[in-house]
Amino acid sequence: MAQQGKVEPQDQDSFLDDQPGIRPIPSFDDMPLHQNLLRGIYSHGFEKPSSIQQRAIVPFTRGGDIIAQAQSGTGKTGAFSIGLLQRLDFRHNVLQGLVLSPTRELAMQTAEVITRIGEFLAEGSSSFCATFVGGTRVQDDYRKLQSGTIVAVGTPGRVVDVTKRGAMRTESLRVLVLDEADEMLSQGFAEQIYDIFRFLPKEIQVALFSATMPDDVLELTKKFMRDPTRILVKRESLTLEGIKQFFIAVEEEHKLDTLMDLYETVSIAQSVIFANTRRKVDWLASQLNSSNHTVSCMHSEMSKQEREKVMGTFRNGSSRVLVTTDLVARGIDVHHVNIVINFDLPTNKENYLHRIGRGGRYGRKGVAINFVTQKDVEVLREIESHYHTQIEELPVDFAAYLGE
Protein backbone atom coordinates (compact mmCIF):
# COMPACT_ATOMS: atom_id res chain seq x y z
CA MET A 1 0.00 0.00 0.00
CA ALA A 2 1.06 3.58 -0.50
CA GLN A 3 1.27 6.35 2.00
CA GLN A 4 -1.39 6.80 4.67
CA GLY A 5 -1.18 10.19 6.35
CA LYS A 6 1.57 12.73 6.59
CA VAL A 7 4.80 12.49 4.63
CA GLU A 8 7.89 13.84 6.32
CA PRO A 9 9.33 16.17 3.68
CA GLN A 10 12.96 16.07 2.66
CA ASP A 11 15.15 18.99 3.56
CA GLN A 12 14.48 21.70 0.99
CA ASP A 13 18.24 22.27 0.63
CA SER A 14 18.69 18.70 -0.60
CA PHE A 15 17.34 19.67 -4.02
CA LEU A 16 19.40 21.36 -6.71
CA ASP A 17 18.36 24.94 -7.28
CA ASP A 18 19.82 25.45 -10.76
CA GLN A 19 16.62 24.44 -12.60
CA PRO A 20 14.61 27.56 -13.44
CA GLY A 21 10.91 27.55 -12.74
CA ILE A 22 10.94 24.98 -9.92
CA ARG A 23 9.01 26.43 -7.00
CA PRO A 24 7.79 24.23 -4.13
CA ILE A 25 3.99 24.28 -3.77
CA PRO A 26 3.25 23.43 -0.10
CA SER A 27 -0.42 22.47 -0.54
CA PHE A 28 -2.32 20.25 -2.97
CA ASP A 29 -5.08 22.88 -2.96
CA ASP A 30 -2.66 25.42 -4.44
CA MET A 31 -1.84 23.17 -7.40
CA PRO A 32 -3.80 23.32 -10.69
CA LEU A 33 -5.60 20.03 -10.05
CA HIS A 34 -9.11 18.87 -10.94
CA GLN A 35 -11.52 18.94 -8.00
CA ASN A 36 -12.26 15.24 -8.31
CA LEU A 37 -8.54 14.51 -8.36
CA LEU A 38 -8.15 16.42 -5.10
CA ARG A 39 -10.97 14.30 -3.63
CA GLY A 40 -9.04 11.19 -4.58
CA ILE A 41 -5.78 12.53 -3.16
CA TYR A 42 -7.29 13.27 0.24
CA SER A 43 -9.40 10.12 0.40
CA HIS A 44 -6.24 8.11 -0.34
CA GLY A 45 -4.68 9.48 2.85
CA PHE A 46 -2.43 12.23 1.53
CA GLU A 47 -2.47 15.32 3.74
CA LYS A 48 0.42 17.48 2.59
CA PRO A 49 2.64 17.05 -0.48
CA SER A 50 6.13 15.70 0.17
CA SER A 51 9.14 17.60 -1.13
CA ILE A 52 9.25 15.73 -4.44
CA GLN A 53 5.48 16.19 -4.85
CA GLN A 54 5.77 19.91 -4.11
CA ARG A 55 8.32 20.26 -6.91
CA ALA A 56 7.34 17.68 -9.54
CA ILE A 57 3.54 17.69 -9.81
CA VAL A 58 3.04 21.16 -11.29
CA PRO A 59 5.81 20.85 -13.95
CA PHE A 60 4.33 17.44 -14.81
CA THR A 61 0.86 18.92 -15.34
CA ARG A 62 2.26 21.46 -17.82
CA GLY A 63 2.97 18.65 -20.27
CA GLY A 64 6.73 18.92 -20.69
CA ASP A 65 9.25 16.12 -20.20
CA ILE A 66 10.47 15.69 -16.64
CA ILE A 67 13.29 13.93 -14.79
CA ALA A 68 12.60 13.65 -11.06
CA GLN A 69 14.75 12.05 -8.42
CA ALA A 70 14.06 11.63 -4.72
CA GLN A 71 14.83 9.17 -1.98
CA SER A 72 12.90 5.95 -1.48
CA GLY A 73 9.80 6.36 0.64
CA THR A 74 9.23 10.05 -0.10
CA GLY A 75 6.21 9.86 -2.37
CA LYS A 76 7.53 9.45 -5.92
CA THR A 77 4.65 7.15 -6.88
CA GLY A 78 2.15 9.68 -5.62
CA ALA A 79 3.92 12.47 -7.51
CA PHE A 80 3.75 10.84 -10.93
CA SER A 81 0.30 9.32 -10.31
CA ILE A 82 -1.18 12.74 -9.57
CA GLY A 83 0.63 14.42 -12.46
CA LEU A 84 -0.41 11.67 -14.85
CA LEU A 85 -4.08 11.70 -13.82
CA GLN A 86 -4.30 15.48 -14.22
CA ARG A 87 -3.06 15.13 -17.82
CA LEU A 88 -5.77 12.66 -18.90
CA ASP A 89 -9.18 13.27 -20.45
CA PHE A 90 -11.62 10.86 -18.82
CA ARG A 91 -14.35 11.70 -21.31
CA HIS A 92 -12.59 9.42 -23.80
CA ASN A 93 -12.11 5.72 -23.04
CA VAL A 94 -8.89 5.31 -25.01
CA LEU A 95 -5.39 4.52 -23.78
CA GLN A 96 -3.76 7.82 -22.77
CA GLY A 97 -1.21 6.96 -20.08
CA LEU A 98 1.49 4.27 -19.89
CA VAL A 99 3.59 3.53 -16.80
CA LEU A 100 6.50 1.11 -17.09
CA SER A 101 7.87 -0.64 -13.99
CA PRO A 102 10.80 -3.05 -13.65
CA THR A 103 8.88 -5.73 -11.70
CA ARG A 104 5.39 -7.25 -11.58
CA GLU A 105 5.03 -6.39 -7.90
CA LEU A 106 5.87 -2.73 -8.40
CA ALA A 107 3.54 -2.49 -11.41
CA MET A 108 0.64 -3.92 -9.42
CA GLN A 109 1.28 -1.64 -6.47
CA THR A 110 1.50 1.41 -8.75
CA ALA A 111 -1.76 0.50 -10.49
CA GLU A 112 -3.46 0.28 -7.11
CA VAL A 113 -2.28 3.78 -6.18
CA ILE A 114 -3.40 5.25 -9.51
CA THR A 115 -6.78 3.51 -9.25
CA ARG A 116 -7.44 4.82 -5.77
CA ILE A 117 -6.31 8.40 -6.43
CA GLY A 118 -8.24 8.49 -9.72
CA GLU A 119 -11.41 6.98 -8.28
CA PHE A 120 -13.54 10.12 -8.54
CA LEU A 121 -12.18 11.15 -11.94
CA ALA A 122 -13.31 7.77 -13.25
CA GLU A 123 -16.68 8.05 -11.50
CA GLY A 124 -16.03 5.05 -9.29
CA SER A 125 -14.84 2.73 -12.06
CA SER A 126 -11.70 0.74 -11.25
CA SER A 127 -11.31 -0.56 -14.80
CA PHE A 128 -9.75 2.65 -16.16
CA CYS A 129 -6.34 1.47 -14.91
CA ALA A 130 -5.06 -2.02 -15.75
CA THR A 131 -1.84 -4.00 -15.32
CA PHE A 132 0.04 -5.77 -18.10
CA VAL A 133 2.67 -8.10 -16.65
CA GLY A 134 4.15 -11.50 -17.37
CA GLY A 135 2.63 -14.63 -15.89
CA THR A 136 -0.92 -13.75 -16.99
CA ARG A 137 -2.92 -14.78 -20.05
CA VAL A 138 -2.58 -12.53 -23.08
CA GLN A 139 -6.31 -13.03 -23.69
CA ASP A 140 -6.97 -11.26 -20.39
CA ASP A 141 -4.87 -8.34 -21.61
CA TYR A 142 -6.99 -8.12 -24.76
CA ARG A 143 -10.14 -8.03 -22.65
CA LYS A 144 -8.79 -5.21 -20.46
CA LEU A 145 -7.84 -3.11 -23.47
CA GLN A 146 -11.21 -3.62 -25.12
CA SER A 147 -13.05 -2.57 -21.96
CA GLY A 148 -11.72 1.00 -22.09
CA THR A 149 -8.37 1.08 -20.30
CA ILE A 150 -7.17 4.68 -19.98
CA VAL A 151 -3.98 3.99 -17.99
CA ALA A 152 -1.79 0.92 -18.55
CA VAL A 153 0.80 -0.06 -15.95
CA GLY A 154 3.13 -2.84 -16.99
CA THR A 155 6.52 -4.44 -17.30
CA PRO A 156 8.47 -3.77 -20.51
CA GLY A 157 8.38 -7.33 -21.84
CA ARG A 158 4.61 -7.71 -21.68
CA VAL A 159 3.96 -4.20 -22.99
CA VAL A 160 6.22 -4.86 -25.98
CA ASP A 161 4.35 -8.13 -26.59
CA VAL A 162 0.80 -6.73 -26.56
CA THR A 163 1.90 -3.69 -28.58
CA LYS A 164 3.54 -5.76 -31.31
CA ARG A 165 0.42 -7.96 -31.45
CA GLY A 166 -1.62 -4.83 -32.17
CA ALA A 167 -3.71 -5.22 -29.01
CA MET A 168 -2.37 -2.11 -27.30
CA ARG A 169 -3.13 0.89 -29.51
CA THR A 170 -0.71 3.70 -28.76
CA GLU A 171 -1.81 6.51 -31.07
CA SER A 172 -3.76 8.29 -28.30
CA LEU A 173 -1.04 8.06 -25.66
CA ARG A 174 -0.28 11.38 -24.01
CA VAL A 175 2.13 10.40 -21.24
CA LEU A 176 4.82 7.76 -20.65
CA VAL A 177 6.22 7.30 -17.14
CA LEU A 178 9.37 5.27 -16.48
CA ASP A 179 9.30 4.29 -12.82
CA GLU A 180 12.67 3.34 -11.27
CA ALA A 181 14.20 4.84 -14.38
CA ASP A 182 17.77 3.85 -13.56
CA GLU A 183 16.74 0.19 -13.64
CA MET A 184 14.50 0.65 -16.67
CA LEU A 185 17.36 2.13 -18.72
CA SER A 186 19.90 -0.48 -17.68
CA GLN A 187 21.17 -2.99 -20.20
CA GLY A 188 18.54 -5.54 -19.16
CA PHE A 189 15.62 -3.34 -20.18
CA ALA A 190 17.10 -0.79 -22.58
CA GLU A 191 16.32 -2.73 -25.76
CA GLN A 192 12.69 -3.29 -24.74
CA ILE A 193 12.30 0.38 -23.82
CA TYR A 194 13.61 1.41 -27.24
CA ASP A 195 11.19 -1.07 -28.85
CA ILE A 196 8.29 0.58 -27.03
CA PHE A 197 9.38 4.07 -28.13
CA ARG A 198 9.08 2.99 -31.76
CA PHE A 199 5.31 2.67 -31.27
CA LEU A 200 4.74 5.92 -29.36
CA PRO A 201 3.46 9.23 -30.72
CA LYS A 202 6.28 11.63 -31.49
CA GLU A 203 4.97 14.33 -29.16
CA ILE A 204 4.35 12.09 -26.14
CA GLN A 205 5.30 13.50 -22.74
CA VAL A 206 8.04 11.44 -21.05
CA ALA A 207 8.54 11.42 -17.27
CA LEU A 208 11.37 9.62 -15.46
CA PHE A 209 11.22 8.94 -11.72
CA SER A 210 13.78 7.15 -9.58
CA ALA A 211 15.65 7.24 -6.27
CA THR A 212 18.97 7.21 -8.12
CA MET A 213 19.89 8.81 -11.43
CA PRO A 214 23.47 7.92 -12.44
CA ASP A 215 25.25 10.12 -14.96
CA ASP A 216 25.18 7.43 -17.67
CA VAL A 217 21.39 7.20 -17.38
CA LEU A 218 21.04 10.98 -17.63
CA GLU A 219 23.17 10.83 -20.77
CA LEU A 220 20.86 8.18 -22.26
CA THR A 221 17.80 10.35 -21.71
CA LYS A 222 19.07 12.80 -24.33
CA LYS A 223 18.07 10.27 -26.99
CA PHE A 224 14.34 10.42 -26.27
CA MET A 225 13.59 13.48 -24.12
CA ARG A 226 13.09 17.08 -25.19
CA ASP A 227 14.51 19.76 -22.88
CA PRO A 228 13.29 18.01 -19.71
CA THR A 229 12.65 19.80 -16.44
CA ARG A 230 15.13 18.33 -13.97
CA ILE A 231 14.48 17.89 -10.27
CA LEU A 232 17.58 16.17 -8.94
CA VAL A 233 18.76 15.77 -5.37
CA LYS A 234 22.35 16.50 -4.48
CA ARG A 235 24.56 13.41 -4.27
CA GLU A 236 25.38 14.07 -0.62
CA SER A 237 21.64 14.00 0.15
CA LEU A 238 21.20 10.45 -1.12
CA THR A 239 20.73 8.78 2.20
CA LEU A 240 17.52 8.24 4.09
CA GLU A 241 16.11 10.50 6.77
CA GLY A 242 14.74 8.44 9.63
CA ILE A 243 16.89 5.40 8.83
CA LYS A 244 19.69 4.75 11.30
CA GLN A 245 22.43 2.73 9.61
CA PHE A 246 24.73 0.30 11.40
CA PHE A 247 27.19 -2.47 10.62
CA ILE A 248 28.22 -5.63 12.43
CA ALA A 249 31.68 -7.02 11.74
CA VAL A 250 31.13 -10.75 11.32
CA GLU A 251 32.66 -13.51 9.26
CA GLU A 252 30.50 -15.55 6.89
CA GLU A 253 30.33 -18.67 9.08
CA HIS A 254 29.03 -16.67 12.05
CA LYS A 255 26.37 -14.63 10.24
CA LEU A 256 23.48 -16.98 11.04
CA ASP A 257 24.27 -17.10 14.77
CA THR A 258 24.56 -13.31 14.81
CA LEU A 259 21.18 -13.01 13.09
CA MET A 260 19.55 -15.34 15.63
CA ASP A 261 21.04 -13.29 18.47
CA LEU A 262 19.54 -10.12 17.00
CA TYR A 263 16.05 -11.57 16.95
CA GLU A 264 16.41 -12.74 20.55
CA THR A 265 17.64 -9.34 21.70
CA VAL A 266 14.85 -7.07 20.48
CA SER A 267 11.19 -7.20 19.58
CA ILE A 268 10.87 -6.43 15.87
CA ALA A 269 7.52 -5.55 14.28
CA GLN A 270 8.46 -6.74 10.79
CA SER A 271 11.78 -7.06 9.04
CA VAL A 272 13.24 -7.64 5.60
CA ILE A 273 16.46 -9.61 5.19
CA PHE A 274 18.39 -9.30 1.94
CA ALA A 275 20.73 -11.99 0.61
CA ASN A 276 22.42 -12.06 -2.78
CA THR A 277 21.48 -15.53 -4.05
CA ARG A 278 18.32 -17.59 -4.33
CA ARG A 279 20.03 -20.52 -2.62
CA LYS A 280 20.98 -18.42 0.40
CA VAL A 281 17.46 -16.98 0.62
CA ASP A 282 15.96 -20.48 0.77
CA TRP A 283 18.56 -21.62 3.30
CA LEU A 284 18.06 -18.59 5.55
CA ALA A 285 14.27 -18.94 5.50
CA SER A 286 14.58 -22.62 6.42
CA GLN A 287 16.93 -21.88 9.33
CA LEU A 288 14.71 -19.12 10.70
CA ASN A 289 11.55 -21.21 10.36
CA SER A 290 13.19 -24.06 12.27
CA SER A 291 13.84 -21.57 15.09
CA ASN A 292 10.10 -20.76 15.30
CA HIS A 293 10.17 -17.45 13.44
CA THR A 294 7.29 -16.77 11.03
CA VAL A 295 9.23 -16.35 7.81
CA SER A 296 8.40 -15.88 4.13
CA CYS A 297 10.90 -15.88 1.30
CA MET A 298 10.78 -14.57 -2.25
CA HIS A 299 13.09 -14.67 -5.26
CA SER A 300 12.90 -14.44 -9.05
CA GLU A 301 12.52 -18.18 -9.68
CA MET A 302 9.13 -18.24 -7.93
CA SER A 303 6.00 -17.93 -10.03
CA LYS A 304 3.99 -14.71 -10.10
CA GLN A 305 1.22 -16.34 -8.06
CA GLU A 306 3.69 -17.57 -5.44
CA ARG A 307 5.27 -14.14 -5.10
CA GLU A 308 1.88 -12.42 -4.76
CA LYS A 309 0.89 -14.90 -2.05
CA VAL A 310 4.14 -14.27 -0.16
CA MET A 311 3.69 -10.48 -0.29
CA GLY A 312 0.07 -10.82 0.83
CA THR A 313 1.11 -12.89 3.83
CA PHE A 314 3.82 -10.39 4.75
CA ARG A 315 1.59 -7.34 4.30
CA ASN A 316 -1.20 -8.70 6.51
CA GLY A 317 1.28 -9.54 9.26
CA SER A 318 0.90 -13.32 9.17
CA SER A 319 4.62 -13.42 8.43
CA ARG A 320 6.98 -11.15 10.37
CA VAL A 321 10.16 -11.77 8.40
CA LEU A 322 10.67 -11.56 4.63
CA VAL A 323 13.90 -13.01 3.24
CA THR A 324 14.54 -11.98 -0.34
CA THR A 325 16.99 -11.07 -3.06
CA ASP A 326 17.05 -7.60 -4.64
CA LEU A 327 13.79 -8.55 -6.37
CA VAL A 328 11.80 -6.45 -3.87
CA ALA A 329 14.46 -3.84 -3.15
CA ARG A 330 12.41 -1.33 -5.15
CA GLY A 331 8.96 -0.05 -4.49
CA ILE A 332 7.45 -2.49 -2.02
CA ASP A 333 5.97 -0.65 0.95
CA VAL A 334 4.91 -2.54 4.08
CA HIS A 335 3.87 -0.21 6.86
CA HIS A 336 5.25 -2.07 9.86
CA VAL A 337 8.74 -2.82 8.57
CA ASN A 338 11.11 -1.17 11.03
CA ILE A 339 14.32 -3.05 10.40
CA VAL A 340 16.21 -4.07 7.26
CA ILE A 341 19.13 -6.47 7.48
CA ASN A 342 21.68 -6.81 4.71
CA PHE A 343 22.80 -10.37 5.40
CA ASP A 344 24.92 -9.79 2.29
CA LEU A 345 25.93 -6.32 1.16
CA PRO A 346 24.40 -5.50 -2.24
CA THR A 347 26.52 -6.04 -5.32
CA ASN A 348 25.76 -2.54 -6.59
CA LYS A 349 25.81 0.73 -4.68
CA GLU A 350 22.46 1.98 -6.01
CA ASN A 351 20.65 -1.06 -4.60
CA TYR A 352 21.84 -0.17 -1.10
CA LEU A 353 19.61 2.90 -1.14
CA HIS A 354 16.64 0.93 -2.48
CA ARG A 355 17.11 -1.83 0.09
CA ILE A 356 17.29 0.25 3.23
CA GLY A 357 14.26 2.25 2.08
CA ARG A 358 12.06 -0.69 3.13
CA GLY A 359 12.30 0.42 6.76
CA GLY A 360 11.12 3.71 8.23
CA ARG A 361 9.12 4.76 5.17
CA TYR A 362 7.22 8.06 5.18
CA GLY A 363 8.90 9.45 8.28
CA ARG A 364 8.66 6.37 10.49
CA LYS A 365 11.77 5.44 12.43
CA GLY A 366 13.74 2.51 11.04
CA VAL A 367 17.06 0.72 11.32
CA ALA A 368 19.33 -0.80 8.69
CA ILE A 369 21.93 -3.34 9.82
CA ASN A 370 24.71 -4.49 7.52
CA PHE A 371 26.61 -7.73 8.07
CA VAL A 372 30.17 -6.96 7.01
CA THR A 373 32.89 -9.57 6.56
CA GLN A 374 36.56 -8.72 6.21
CA LYS A 375 36.12 -8.96 2.43
CA ASP A 376 33.22 -6.47 2.58
CA VAL A 377 35.05 -3.65 4.34
CA GLU A 378 36.05 -1.94 1.11
CA VAL A 379 32.50 -2.28 -0.27
CA LEU A 380 31.11 -0.62 2.86
CA ARG A 381 33.58 2.24 2.49
CA GLU A 382 32.50 2.70 -1.13
CA ILE A 383 28.85 2.88 -0.05
CA GLU A 384 29.72 5.48 2.61
CA SER A 385 31.69 7.52 0.09
CA HIS A 386 29.01 7.28 -2.61
CA TYR A 387 26.24 8.54 -0.31
CA HIS A 388 28.43 10.83 1.82
CA THR A 389 27.22 9.06 4.92
CA GLN A 390 28.72 7.30 7.90
CA ILE A 391 27.60 3.81 8.89
CA GLU A 392 28.34 3.21 12.56
CA GLU A 393 29.11 -0.02 14.36
CA LEU A 394 26.02 -1.43 16.06
CA PRO A 395 26.00 -0.25 19.70
CA VAL A 396 25.14 -2.47 22.63
CA ASP A 397 21.98 -0.45 23.36
CA PHE A 398 20.75 -0.41 19.73
CA ALA A 399 17.27 -1.58 20.82
CA ALA A 400 16.63 2.05 21.77
CA TYR A 401 16.52 2.93 18.07
CA LEU A 402 13.48 0.69 17.69
CA GLY A 403 11.59 2.61 20.32
CA GLU A 404 12.23 0.21 23.16
UniProtKB/Swiss-Prot annotation:
Q: Which residues form the Helicase ATP-binding domain?
A: 57-231
Q: Note the PROSITE patterns from the entry.
A: DEAD_ATP_HELICASE (PS00039), HELICASE_ATP_BIND_1 (PS51192), HELICASE_CTER (PS51194), Q_MOTIF (PS51195)
Q: What is its EC number?
A: 3.6.4.13
Q: Origin, by domain of life?
A: Eukaryota
Q: Which Gene3D superfamilies match?
A: P-loop containing nucleotide triphosphate hydrolases
Keyword Nucleotide-binding belongs to the record: yes
Query: Catalytic activity annotated for this protein?
Result: ATP + H2O = ADP + phosphate + H(+)
The UniProt record lists the Helicase C-terminal domain at 242-402
A GO molecular function annotation here is: ATP binding
Q: Where is this motif: DEAD box?
A: 179-182
In Pfam terms, one family for this protein is Helicase_C
Record-annotated residues binding ATP?
Answer: 70-77
Q: Place the motif Q motif on the sequence.
A: 26-54
SMART domains named in the record? DEXDc, HELICc
Q: Where is this region: Disordered?
A: 1-28
The cellular component terms of Gene Ontology attached to this UniProt record, alphabetical and capped at eight, are: cytoplasm; cytoplasmic stress granule; cytosol; eukaryotic translation initiation factor 4F complex
GO BP, sorted A to Z: cytoplasmic translational initiation
Keywords, A to Z, come to: ATP-binding, Helicase, Hydrolase, Initiation factor, Nucleotide-binding, Protein biosynthesis, RNA-binding
InterPro entries, per the entry = DEAD/DEAH_box_helicase_dom, Helicase_ATP-bd, Helicase_C-like, P-loop_NTPase, RNA-helicase_DEAD-box_CS, RNA_helicase_DEAD_Q_motif
The record's family statement is: Belongs to the DEAD box helicase family. eIF4A subfamily.
Its biological purpose is as follows: ATP-dependent RNA helicase which is a subunit of the eIF4F complex involved in cap recognition and is required for mRNA binding to ribosome. In the current model of translation initiation, eIF4A unwinds RNA secondary structures in the 5'-UTR of mRNAs which is necessary to allow efficient binding of the small ribosomal subunit, and subsequent scanning for the initiator codon.
Self-association or partners: how does it assemble? eIF4F is a multi-subunit complex, the composition of which varies with external and internal environmental conditions. It is composed of at least EIF4A, EIF4E and EIF4G.
Q: Supply the name of the protein.
A: Probable eukaryotic initiation factor 4A
User: What's the source species for this entry?
Assistant: Trypanosoma brucei brucei (strain 927/4 GUTat10.1)
